[in-house]
Amino acid sequence: MNLIALVLLAASAVLFAGGAGAQQSPSPPPPPLIDWDKIQIKTTDLGNNTYMLEGQGGNITVAVGTDGIIMVDGQFAPLSAKIKAAIAAISPLPIKYLINTHFHGDHTGGNENFAKDGAVVVAQDNIRVRLAAGTINGITGAKTEPRPAGALPKETYIGGTKTVQVGGRTAQLTHGTNAHTDGDTWVYFADANVLCTGDTSNNTKRYQTIDFANGGDIRGMIAANEAYLRAANDSTKVVVGHGPLAKRSDVAEFHAMLVTARERIEKLVNEGKSEAEVVAARPLADLDAKWAANEGAATAFTRMVYNSFKRS
């Protein structure tokens, strides 16, 4: 998949990561570059009746209880039938809750399809607000149309945490304030030691989008990953937004990159440098060599970090 084209078309949520792990725009319908018939759903057993599903879009987590299923994220609408089939191969029990980690369409595109089957869509309230109103991407200017009522979360929370329980399984939801977006939720299944980060962290070894136009902020991204490092141990299975199953050490590497990027760009912001001046200075050149697939990715990430400090 050509990630440059995806970004220009649809304001990708993981910058130029390449391959099947790359994210699409915050809004369905997705661009017509994807041959949905060729996408396969890969299932990984995480232990204790908990599973990770990979397809096209954000990683999915499935936790099976005695009388139903908790699902975290739902990828794109055209993949719902394949995702349902993959879950049915795990368990015949109904999906009772679908938790959204944030509003971007590669994580929420399946909301309406799963809700029609009886799943209650749960999210931090800012996700509902963003989906209902539509959004604009700060880098590309791409507009996202409002989602239909059937795609909106039916159960939301505003405080810092929420608990979802099904048949002996407990999902602990925590709002990561102003991180990837303003509505990020990370989810922890303590009985399986599985942590789901959404797009506040990734394991693609590429830069991550900071959706500053919709409340994203590198400082919140750093805070979220610090929370993961506190919560995780060496045995924790980390289902990141994109990329293969991660370990605590992967989160630590991603966190270190974010901290370095923040320190360097914040210094230039404090010196009064403009966005163009910061981009021209290439303060992340050494990081770009590892974390950016190309110059466009490097520029976009620098702009996103800069604009974190310019949010109103």
Residue ranges and their predicted role:
Residues N49, A63, D73, I87, ...:
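Divalent metal-coordination and catalytic microenvironments
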Residues T43, T66-I70, P78-V122:
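Active-site metal-binding motif and surrounding structural segment of the metallo-beta-lactamase
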